[in-house]
Structures are given as C-alpha cells and as structure tokens.
Amino acid sequence: ENNVCFMIAQVLRFWPEYELIKELYDSGKYGKLLSGYMGRLGSYPAWSWDNWMMDEKRSGLVPYDLHIHDLDFLVYAFGKPEASLKHRAKQPNQDYLTAVYEFPGFFVTTEASWYASAYPFGASYRFQFEDALVTYEKGECKIYENNGSIYSPTEQATGDTGSINLPKSDAYAEEIKYFKNCVLSGQFPDRVKAEELRTVVGLLNEF
C-alpha cells in the first residue's frame, strides 16, 4: 500500500538449530515426525524501561514475549495447526502457559513461563522422528539415532560423511542480512509470510 519493503523479525526462522528441524521434516531424512516439545522458561523481567515488560497492554506478557517464538516456528515449519489445547496460569508468582498443537500425524507440546524466583532463562526442544530423536538443550543440539549413534551436528560436518552440517552463525545477523539483501534486490522478504504471522497472532490471542 505504501510501496515499502518491510519484514517482521522472527529470529528462530534463521536459527541453525531450529532450521535443522524444518530441514529434517521437509527431507524426511529420519522418517516422519511423530511428536515434539518446545519450551521457553525464565523469570519475571526486571530490566525493562518503565516496567514496560510487566504492562500487559504494552508487552503482552509471556504469550508475546516468549511463546510467540516457538509458536511462530511451528507455523513456519509445519503450517497452521489443525487444533490446539491451551492452559495458562497468570498469578502473582508466575505467568505460565502450556499448549498442545496438533498437526497431521503428530502433535507438539509447548510451555513458556515467567517465574517469580530467579530461574535462569532457557530455551529447548525435542523432536521425535521415526528414526531419531533430535534435541536442543542448554545450547547444544544432539541427534540420537535409533541405531545407537549419538552426535552433535557441527560446522565441520561434511556431506561425504553422511553427517549434518550446522553453520556457525549469528541468527540475528543472518536475519538482518536476509532483509538487507531483499531491500537491495527489490525482492519481498517472503521467508516471513504475512498469513503465517496472522495465524500466530490469532492463536496467541486465545490465551
């Protein structure tokens, strides 16, 4: 409408360990996806200006601060959920939510929280494919194959070994680089599609 190039930043779409899940799902390398888990847990943010983060009208609290990232990735990687079951406990000592999203042939359980105690922030996932379990915990990605092999994808991996290459990169820098290249080339940044974001916001508003 205004003839400008814009992109809403959703950094997990550029995060190597998360991109890996989409690649494995699309390629079928380890068979069909059977189930998944994504979590994003931490404590109440005390660092924001003017207590901005604790003002629901401005920040949206846990659904929009934390859960939005995992939900956006799910919609990006697997499409719009067929159904969902959501629970939220918004109390003085916690803002905690959990949701199960159903997709054709599998479901993903998610959780996100702000706790009143000084619980350290952490993001994690587990995705169970037919032939392997892929995890991301404490900043490390591991693949547990059904044949007993366990390994961490690394930037040193090469195609001729059959292992998976994870580029060592800064997801935020890759996101900015992608948008910059779209602006310079005159291409619309369709890696972050408006219809996917509308789906995400619609689901978040149900909490």
Where are these regions (language model features)?
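Conserved loop-to-helix N-cap of the C-terminal "lid" that shapes the substrate pocket in Rossmann-like
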Residues: 64-67, 169, 191-197
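Short beta-strand scaffold segments in enzyme catalytic cores
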Residues: 99-101
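Structured helix-beta-strand junction loops
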Residues: 1-3, 80, 104, 130
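Predominantly a Rossmann-like dinucleotide-binding segment in NAD(P)-dependent oxidoreductases
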Residues: 4-5, 12-87
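Hydrophobic residues in well-ordered beta-strands that form the structural core
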Residues: 6-8, 136
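NAD(P)-dinucleotide binding in Rossmann-like oxidoreductases
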Residues: 89-94, 103-175, 190
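C-terminal helix-rich "cap/oligomerization" subdomain common to oxidoreductases
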Residues: 1, 27, 104, 164, ...
